[in-house]
């Protein structure tokens, strides 16, 4: 570590209990996407205590700025740091002392940790404005779990002046203390779809007089997998998953209507576009073949998350200096979980780091995200906060 990194890291360590308290507060009081009003208020309260100017963004999000007082040659740089803040509609089944107090809702994806770590980073950065020139933009993004927030923040113009973007995500399948930072594809795109199939009802004993929407839907489900296995290069990363199917009204009536919902996930914009076009064609033509019709509705949750090569190399340099070679992972299997921080990177070159939060000695920290027993090893909060702080300061100083 450099002398500056050592100083900043010591401050992050000293604030560990503060960040843990914040994280546990957010964990006890989870709020779903676009409902994060109390969370927003708690963030604002902490920023007020720190004397950091802020405003609301994307309805339930928070935007803040910290301007450095150091001087530099040339145009000062600007970086945006991001944390997502929404929870999930899951009933928590484990029983930590900070268990969710809201029935049917919990932080099962680490967003409570991201939120707390960014507040902790803001506290350190604000106390060390003399160490950097330029400006740090802080965004607490709502609604990530439903593909909301990122685009709304971008469209507000809040991050237009940024030259770099940086975000983190807890990773239960990475040991606490380690960081994953790799260039290029990290996360798949996420597109939601609903296919409605229209048939013709009739008595089950006279199938020739009806058009069986349930049968058509089942054929679409099976055929959709051939778009992956028979229409896509085996080395390309594509997933088509169907999670719900509903059809018919009773046992002895041919289903007149059927509906299914699912997701398409791809690692490149080209493959994403191709898969969506082919699935829509398949659904409509399959329905027509059996005398029915189909319509497909889409919602874009997230683009493929592609870490910028230069920004990732910069963040890797910071991470290597902070944590050492053995704790920085620069290549691993890509994830089919999406994150609309991808929109930030498309707007402002940036990097997204996975922060290890799993500890085999604490089994709940190793279960998958979106599990009712999910938890994090809170030592990961220090790693996340240190990354936010040190990468931002070093980028603004032109040291990475």
Language-model segments: what does each one mean?
Residues 26, 64, 81, 111, ...:
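Divalent metal-coordination and catalytic microenvironments
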Residues 88-90, 94-106, 112-113, 119, ...:
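Histidine/acidic-residue-rich, glycine-tolerant segments that coordinate divalent metal ions
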Residues 2-107, 112, 116-132:
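Acidic/His- and Gly-rich active-site-bordering loop/insert found
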Residues 4, 15-18, 22, 35-46, ...:
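General structural feature for long, well-ordered alpha-helical segments within catalytic domains
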Residues 31, 84-86, 143, 171, ...:
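Active-site beta-loop-alpha junctions enriched in small/polar residues
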Residues 80-82, 91, 193, 352-358:
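Non-cysteine beta-strand/loop elements that form the S-adenosyl-L-methionine
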Residues 218-400:
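Metal-dependent amide/peptide-bond hydrolase catalytic core
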């Amino acid at each position: 570590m450099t002398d500056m990194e050592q100083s900043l890291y010591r401050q992050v360590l000293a604030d560990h209990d503060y960040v843990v308290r914040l994280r546990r507060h957010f964990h006890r009081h989870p709020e779903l996407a676009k409902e994060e009003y109390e969370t927003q208020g708690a963030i604002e309260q902490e920023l007020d205590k720190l004397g950091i100017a802020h405003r609301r963004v994307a309805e339930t999000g928070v935007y803040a700025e910290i301007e450095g007082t150091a001087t530099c040659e040339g145009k000062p740089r600007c970086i945006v740091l991001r944390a997502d803040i929404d929870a999930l509609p899951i009933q928590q089944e484990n029983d930590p002392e900070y268990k969710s107090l809201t029935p049917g809702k919990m932080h099962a994806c680490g967003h409570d940790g991201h939120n707390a770590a960014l507040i902790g980073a803001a506290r350190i950065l604000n106390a060390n404005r003399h160490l950097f020139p330029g400006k740090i933009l802080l965004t607490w993004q709502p609604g990530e779990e439903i593909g909301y927030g990122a685009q709304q923040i971008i469209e507000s113009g809040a991050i237009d002046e940024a030259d770099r973007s940086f975000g983190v995500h807890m990773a239960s399948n990475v040991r606490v203390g380690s960081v994953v930072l790799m260039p290029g594809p990290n996360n798949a795109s996420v597109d939601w779809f609903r296919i409605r199939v229209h048939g013709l009802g009739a008595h089950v004993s006279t199938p020739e007089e009806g058009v069986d929407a349930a049968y058509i839907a089942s054929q679409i489900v099976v055929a959709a997998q051939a778009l992956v296995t028979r229409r896509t290069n085996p080395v390309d990363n594509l997933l088509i998953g169907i999670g719900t199917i509903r059809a018919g009204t009773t046992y002895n009536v041919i289903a007149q209507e059927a509906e299914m919902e699912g997701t398409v996930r791809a690692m490149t914009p080209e493959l994403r576009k191709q898969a969506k076009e082919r699935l829509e064609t398949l659904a409509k033509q399959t329905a027509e073949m059996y005398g029915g019709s189909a319509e497909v509705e889409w919602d874009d949750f997230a683009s493929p998350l592609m870490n910028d090569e230069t920004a990732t190399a910069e963040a890797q340099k910071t991470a290597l200096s902070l944590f050492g070679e053995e704790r920085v992972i620069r290549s691993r299997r890509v994830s089919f979980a999406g994150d609309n921080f991808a929109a930030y990177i498309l707007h402002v070159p940036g990097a997204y780091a996975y922060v290890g939060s799993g500890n085999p000695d604490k089994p709940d920290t190793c279960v998958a995200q979106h599990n009712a027993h999910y938890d994090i090893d809170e030592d990961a909060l220090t790693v996340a906060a240190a990354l936010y702080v040190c990468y931002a300061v070093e980028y603004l100083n032109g040291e990475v």
